[in-house]
Regions:
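An acidic, glycine-rich, mixed-charge low-complexity segment common to nucleic-acid enzymes
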Residues: 1-5, 54, 108
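Arg/Lys-rich, positively charged N-terminal/basic patches that mediate binding to nucleic acids
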Residues: 1-37
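Short, solvent-exposed polar/charged micro-motifs at secondary-structure junctions
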Residues: 14, 57-60, 108
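Short, charged helix-to-loop "capping" segments that act as catalytic/coupling loops
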Residues: 23, 50, 82-86
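Amphipathic alpha-helical interface surfaces
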Residues: 28-35, 55, 71, 75
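A short, surface-exposed loop/turn module that caps and links secondary-structure elements
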Residues: 42-67
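Enriched for short, Lys/Arg-rich terminal
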Residues: 66-108
């Protein structure tokens, strides 16, 4: 799969990861990128054991088109496919990293 990094993601990455010298979290994000690049589509990724290790999830209800991955107890990486919503996992071959969310998970 192809990963596209948005400006919001790069800003959050520098602000929340780089400036605070979170080496463990930086390594985890690099591992997530390698795993996503290793698969051809989301169906293969969701069938692999990495789905449970890194907690890949699809949001529910009105945020159905958003996927999240746990970085640590506080931070989650938010991703969105670059195709229109009524899709199945085989069609998803490009993901955009939207941002790093730290608002709804407490202080870790």
């Amino acid at each position: 799969m192809i990963i596209i990094k948005s400006k919001g993601y790069l800003k959050d990455y520098n602000k929340l990861i780089k400036r605070k010298h979170l080496v463990k979290e930086e390594n985890r994000i690099n591992d997530i990128e390698k795993i996503i690049n290793a698969f051809n589509n989301m169906q293969e990724l969701f069938a692999s054991p990495y789905k449970n290790i890194y907690n890949f999830e699809q949001k529910k209800e009105n945020l159905k088109e958003i996927f999240t991955v746990r970085i640590n107890h506080k931070l989650r990486l938010v991703m969105k496919p670059l195709i229109e919503y009524p899709y199945n996992y085989i069609e998803i071959e490009e993901l955009e990293f939207i941002n790093i969310d730290d608002k709804h998970y407490g202080e870790g």
